[in-house]
């Protein structure tokens, strides 16, 4: 029989890693950190690290629960807007190594990523671009700090299936004691193409989340449900110049 040429695609088609991400269907999101111990959702950036002192934390128990519920991965808030880091970074004192947890020798990013490997589910990280603790937020120096943090997370914890960049950017914060409000241009300040290049080089299988993609995006609400017939359009104009 005569061969028939496949028609050209008339709509955008997903990359292979986006297809794999969709196949996961459900995964857990762990919003945990210094705020957990200070009754805050969005920390101001001024909470004392000494208040972070979980005494019965068991990341393996977390992952076992996720596995039993049918989830295929987990994403962790490695750093939320308050700027506190759940890994022992050398880039700031505002991190887990200056807490009572395991006498400053803990690393929850490591503990959770290792538990994921042990029980066979995927691991991902959330890294807030906005940082209400750092005195230099809003300057070019902070952007370099942000990229060094991103490099640490991409280089030291094995494979990650997603990198989550939150859309909340700029506003009031502690900022090294200045206690003021700072405004940035979210489309240009972080130079996101640089982030995408770094991720493609260090974690090529990872899907990138932001308000507008390029891998996947915010569903549009925080109720846990997408609207009916959600085509997951990537609203690039909200994030990129």
Feature-to-residue mapping (PLM):
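Mature catalytic domains of secreted/periplasmic carbohydrate-active enzymes
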Residues: 1-241
């Amino acid at each position: 029989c005569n061969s028939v040429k496949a028609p050209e695609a008339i709509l955008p088609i997903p990359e292979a890693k986006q297809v794999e991400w969709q196949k996961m269907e459900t995964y857990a999101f762990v919003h945990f950190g210094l705020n957990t111990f200070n009754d805050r959702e969005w920390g101001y950036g001024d909470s004392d690290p000494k208040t972070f002192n979980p005494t019965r934390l068991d990341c393996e128990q977390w992952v076992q629960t996720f596995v039993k519920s049918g989830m295929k991965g987990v994403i962790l808030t490695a750093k939320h807007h308050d700027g506190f880091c759940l890994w022992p970074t050398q880039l700031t004192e505002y991190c887990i190594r200056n807490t009572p947890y395991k006498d400053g020798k803990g690393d929850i990013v490591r503990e959770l990523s290792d538990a994921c490997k042990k029980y066979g589910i995927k691991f991902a990280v959330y890294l807030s671009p906005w940082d209400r603790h750092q005195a230099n937020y809003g300057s070019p120096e902070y952007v370099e700090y942000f990229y060094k943090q991103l490099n640490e997370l991409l280089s030291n914890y094995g494979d990650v299936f997603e990198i989550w960049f939150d859309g909340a950017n700029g506003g009031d914060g502690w900022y090294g004691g200045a206690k003021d409000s700072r405004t940035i241009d979210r489309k240009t300040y972080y130079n996101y193409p640089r982030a995408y290049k770094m991720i493609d080089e260090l974690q090529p299988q990872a899907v990138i989340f932001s308000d507008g993609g390029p891998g996947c995006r915010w569903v549009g609400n925080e109720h846990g449900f997408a609207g009916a017939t959600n085509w997951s359009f990537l609203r690039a104009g909200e994030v990129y110049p």
